[in-house]
């Protein structure tokens, strides 16, 4: 029997119950499944067991139990727009489940469910109702036998709600659901009645009896091995156990909502806080799995979630990003400790999650500021039941980048309908315009068709570049201009050459293609002097996955189809490529092992001169972290570790711990695994044989390239030596410039810096005197001191310094400085006045006068614009300020 109703204890109780009853415990599978392209996200507990359900004879276990992370946004199941409006909808939720693959069936499933809710959870049987599919008399009789409840508590449902199927064909079967009755003080009717959507009777557990195989013609055939799939929403059962009928009143959501209210300073608008609490949770889990906001697929769904929450933050009139401030509550041990305990990835990715939430919310705020006034203006003229023009919705989407789903959210709150036809008419017109622009096949399409013909005629290229740097080969095809087959290429011609066999690595997996030389040695069965006919290979590309295309310039003589050549790569360049590629693998390993295990590769470039590695991480690496990385790299390189590669099946590679990139597509069989000590990655690139061949390793830069994505650039070997020499040369030049020995450079620079600061302060003092001489006007508007002045020849940074120095809590300072045809305005607003007016509000006012837009925050803002002599900025601002302060 449970003693504590916290969500973490409920989950543990469920898992422990089924583990004691012979079920193997499975951890939650990821939300993003790499091997199931049919799903955007995992949306049910049974997803990771699909193969066992479709072929139970090959299942490696008979029974299983899990608590599964689920996301229902996009695709067939999409709860995004319902979140906040109902008591039970979430984007992210956990599903508790027990599963049988040919072991127990209906009786076992019903008995387990009954024992858990009655004996473990101690629910009153008088509060429980059960539904069965209308023709599933067996389930009806079993519930009656096992529970002893009256017939009236077992309800037959005729709709498809109580019949589950995996798809149009395949395994399927009737369902049975357990409902909890909250009592007659809550509105709602029994399942199957017109009032069933009320909150009184809540489904807490669904048992699916997979007993049929549906054929193409709709015929249901009995499965030889019947299976069980059950699902219990953790949040729903937590609500029951905590005595509330609203999921957002359970301890987890109460903590998140309280954090949202506290951080925003706004305890009104419960709907907004619910949405923020829900969306923080789902966004955090997606980011923890390596997803970043983007414009396509899963990445766009993450962006939609964050942006929808950002819009509700905006409704709270909170100026800063909020979600990243709420997130720490999710991993707080006292508030929502169960998340961090059961899902440690949230802790590991904490910095990344907070960084992405903050950046994405701040970026979208600009869109909200530009687009919402237009929408609000349109809605002012509409009442509940009216229809918003599809043209306006399209304009918001097309011109301002304002998501349609957020527009629909806003008008839903106003009771306004949406002119879908008008919107889609605009969309279709845009698509037609796009079609006209692309009615002719693109160059890329034509090139692909061209190479398909060549592949059918010549076959795939055999690559031998892992084992050797040179080989004899036959010229199969010569292409000029990218789309013209020729029989011969002469001196000066730039051509693409296809061989039957090649040692040249074609650019892929981030690694640049090889360069080198072709020497013709046999033509029309006659041996030739190797130096008479030479082609320089300037790049190697891969087309249609298996054609290695050598981009060449004929340097001497000619090259003909059918020639036998001696193909040799630039060995020194290849060695540098190998060193940088192996160093990239080691860098990935060191980042995960020393910095953050949740780090994921997001891209790479391996050239002969340098390597570039993009990875998911929310904050800049510190100098200490960069030094640690270099030290660990030195240890691995100097350890002379062997670099081993082998080919195996994809499932065996992943099972063996090999890192697979989510963005890459891999074959099921014949994948190549490269191992360097504890580093294992799927990789088709070339590598050193021992790590000592890498030589030295030096990071030359680390920076942000996108939201939540960092980039490291590094050099190895002789390029690292060149880098050290350049740095030494620069240091010597600096020493000469400041006229001290190299060892004293830092001391001298520090002295010069202090002197420079003294001079800057003296200059600021002079400018401050100039401001005072030019005159600062002071007026009292109510209890507010308004200081203002039209200045000349005062730099912007000095105006800002002056304002910061003299700004008090109940003071507003406005300076305007005219230079030729332009004017710069800087305004400061004391913090006690922010509830009525902010510095950025003044910038907006002035923007209409100077035909420009400015920026800043509540305390300090500035704007640069066109000086219009006829417009008195100070008088206009003063007049509007009087109006604001008098309200």
UniProtKB/Swiss-Prot annotation:
One of its GO terms (cellular component) is cytosol. Zn(2+) binds at residues 581, 585, 683, 687. Gene3D superfamilies: 2.40.30.130, 3.10.310.40, 3.30.54.20, Bira Bifunctional Protein, Domain 2, Threonyl-trna Synthetase, Chain A, domain 2. Pfam families: tRNA-synt_2c (PF01411), tRNA_SAD (PF07973). The lineage of its organism: Bacteria, Pseudomonadati, Pseudomonadota, Alphaproteobacteria, Rickettsiales. Catalyzes the attachment of alanine to tRNA(Ala) in a two-step reaction: alanine is first activated by ATP to form Ala-AMP and then transferred to the acceptor end of tRNA(Ala). Also edits incorrectly charged Ser-tRNA(Ala) and Gly-tRNA(Ala) via its editing domain. Consists of three domains; the N-terminal catalytic domain, the editing domain and the C-terminal C-Ala domain. The editing domain removes incorrectly charged amino acids, while the C-Ala domain, along with tRNA(Ala), serves as a bridge to cooperatively bring together the editing and aminoacylation centers thus stimulating deacylation of misacylated tRNAs. The gene is alaS. It catalyses: tRNA(Ala) + L-alanine + ATP = L-alanyl-tRNA(Ala) + AMP + diphosphate. It is an enzyme of class 6 (ligase). Keywords: Aminoacyl-tRNA synthetase, ATP-binding, Cytoplasm, Ligase, Metal-binding, Nucleotide-binding, Protein biosynthesis, RNA-binding, tRNA-binding, Zinc. Its cofactor is Zn(2+). This is Alanine--tRNA ligase. PANTHER family: ALANINE--TRNA LIGASE, CYTOPLASMIC (PTHR11777:SF9), ALANYL-TRNA SYNTHETASE (PTHR11777).
